[in-house]
Regions:
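Twin-arginine (Tat) signal peptide motif
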Residues: 1-9
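Zinc-dependent deaminase catalytic domain
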Residues: 9-13, 17-20, 30-435
């Protein structure tokens, strides 16, 4: 996995009437002071600095310096803040991917869905999520799924949904495009860009300072450099690995995955990019025995072993899709194995990044819904770079949803931000030979 969500970050041209903002320095950022009050914000600048402080928390913990805050739009009351938590530190030193979906915005939406009734929180339309960087496809789709307003500080011209700074969201299909236009706003910057987008966001009539904008960029780029230097090597090629399914020494690896998925390593296909009927039957059975589930996703390692699979839990949490749970399960189990001195060596001899494996959907995502686009974005966040090999695809499915055609599913990919369309080259493919 190439975990860098926004390695090629630059600040795009400003919105209409604004000035271009140059790329931020990758030197040492100035210390980010703690807000005087993290319980309430009183304007756009204090909201932006709260998000910046949250981003710094992510960087300080060894992950990316991107963060967000969830506030009541009318009052400025802060409900929650979340930094990026994709990476965690290891007991032996260095960092490792723990959850490829743990971007701040996605975590905020999962928290809101889990706490809304218990805490009596206001409706999504009365809330604003402010984020230090334009949301990636996964996070934007999570925000659209819930229906909150979104205030953005800095543009991301590589993976952000407003990557071209036009505010048209032409990279998204309808009805997502119209929904983004109605809920996403980009704060004006003193001496720089004009406001762009929806006026429904908190403090839409107030600008932020260029210093805060610059600090958001510097915090991210510096943290990305630190992640690259601190992360433990994780992308071993299959030729250098030992098949855990046939290696008696890998029993602890197998048992770790069987805790949540008892069938782990009991199915092995001849070619890892050619799922067979047994994989289909396993996913169908998983849905059948999971109350309320309608979909399941499995992960095949480069040796063809069905390592893990998950059914969706969307009745519990809309963002608990089968893919999100599956990719999270693989990453977190792998992290735990690498983080233990007893299993570190065998884990590194047996497991590698998902780019070398295959994700198999029982039913492909519906790209015309925010939930479906969430899965496509989460796949991109998981991979971070091209699959190896690229053909056959590492993104496969047995069935299509409703009236969606294979052509429509692929056509949605082409306009997506460069990370997804040019780098990863996401290419959903129907499983061959299984009816």
């Amino acid at each position: 996995m190439n975990p860098t969500r926004r390695d090629l970050l630059t600040w795009g041209a400003a919105a209409a009437g604004g000035l271009a903002l140059s790329a931020c320095s990758t030197g040492n950022p100035k210390p980010v002071p703690s807000p005087t009050d993290t319980g309430v914000v009183t304007g756009a600048e204090s909201l932006a600095t709260l998000a910046l402080w949250t981003a710094q928390r992510g960087a300080d913990a060894g992950s990316y310096g991107i963060g967000g805050a969830l506030v009541e739009s009318a009052t400025g009351r802060v409900l929650q803040t979340m930094p990026n938590r994709v990476f965690r530190t290891l007991s032996a030193g260095g960092t490792f991917v723990d959850d490829p979906t743990a971007h701040g915005e996605r975590q905020l939406m999962s928290w809101y869905l889990a706490q809304r009734e218990t805490l009596g929180l206001v409706s999504p339309g009365e809330l604003t999520v402010v984020t230090t960087l334009d949301p990636c496809l996964m996070c934007a789709s999570a925000l659209l799924t819930v229906g909150v307003n979104v205030g953005v500080i800095a543009i991301d011209d590589y993976s952000g949904v407003n990557y071209d700074s036009s505010g048209s969201f032409a990279d998204l299909p309808e009805p997502l495009r119209g929904q983004a236009t109605a809920t996403f706003g980009y704060y004006a910057v003193d001496g720089g860009r004009a406001f762009q987008g929806s006026r429904a966001i908190a403090y839409a009539d107030q600008p932020i300072t260029s210093d805060t904008l610059d600090a958001c960029g510097t915090t991210y780029t510096t943290s990305a450099d630190q992640v690259r230097s601190a992360r433990r090597a994780s992308g071993a090629t299959p030729a250098t690995l030992t098949d855990p399914g046939t290696n008696p020494a890998a029993i602890d690896v197998i048992r770790a995955f069987q805790v949540e998925f008892p069938e782990a390593f009991t199915i092995r296909v001849k070619e890892p990019r050619q799922p067979d009927r047994r994989v289909y039957d396993a996913l169908v059975d998983l849905v059948r025995r999971s109350p309320g589930a309608t979909n399941a996703v499995g992960f095949l390692d480069p040796f063809g072993n069905l390592v893990t699979a998950r059914a969706d839990q969307r009745e519990v949490n809309t963002l608990s899709t089968a893919f999100a749970l599956c990719t999270r399960a693989y990453a977190q189990t792998r992290y735990a194995l690498v983080n233990s001195a007893a299993t570190l060596t065998i884990a590194e001899q047996s497991l590698t990044n998902p780019n070398y494996g295959t994700f198999v959907f029982l039913q492909a995502p519906d790209p015309f819904t925010p939930e479906g686009m969430f899965d496509i974005g989460a796949y991109g966040s998981t991979m971070g770079g091209a699959a190896m090999p690229a053909i056959p695809s590492a993104f496969q499915y047995f069935d299509l949803p409703g009236s969606v055609t294979a052509r429509q599913l692929q056509d949605v990919i082409y306009p997506l931000p460069p990370l997804y369309s040019d780098n990863i080259k996401i290419s959903p493919q129907r499983v061959v030979g299984v009816n």
